[in-house]
């Protein structure tokens, strides 16, 4: 899960204030449909994730935020742990959203995959059959992998999932092996990783799915 939605407070009957770190036209279309169906106006305050969280914290109970939308469960879990959300789960959400895509204080509205990109010219497709994240530690990929820095929330959530499934020690060993397999020091965003493969700097990249579609559009 990667794009998440969290209730902060109670809106006025005729409007709802959304603090959003997302920047997609599809969201605007969703808000417009909501207003057309309910008559409730949607006010959107856009900004960077950290800036929005800082504002909400500083404003406290006086915050005008009703809903907070951001990317990745990792961000929401940390904000939730700070006590910034309230239990607002409705029966509708429980019916529509699978339990692994929500908590008692937030729910997912979309999901994205963090996948493995590869160069078809330099990588044999047979080497990728059944490939898992864990396989990125295989020495055969030495000098061939690019991925964002470890402080990126997408990578942090990926590591968290590996810890959940494989334990801390195994994940620590995996991380060290992946570092040894890197084609370069981590830099740039997800698009930069994909471009590195296209440019021949690496054979394998880890990045979210939608970036390729955006780059091709």
Q: Language model features by range: what are they?
A:
Residues 1-7:
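Bacterial N-terminal signal peptides
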Residues 30, 173-174, 208:
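Short amphipathic alpha-helical coupling segments at ligand-binding clamshell hinges
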Residues 13-78:
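Early extracytoplasmic/lumenal segment of secretory-pathway proteins
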Residues 49-50, 190-191, 209:
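Conserved glycosyltransferase catalytic-site signature
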Residues 208-217:
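A beta-strand-loop signature enriched in Asp, Gly, Thr, and Trp
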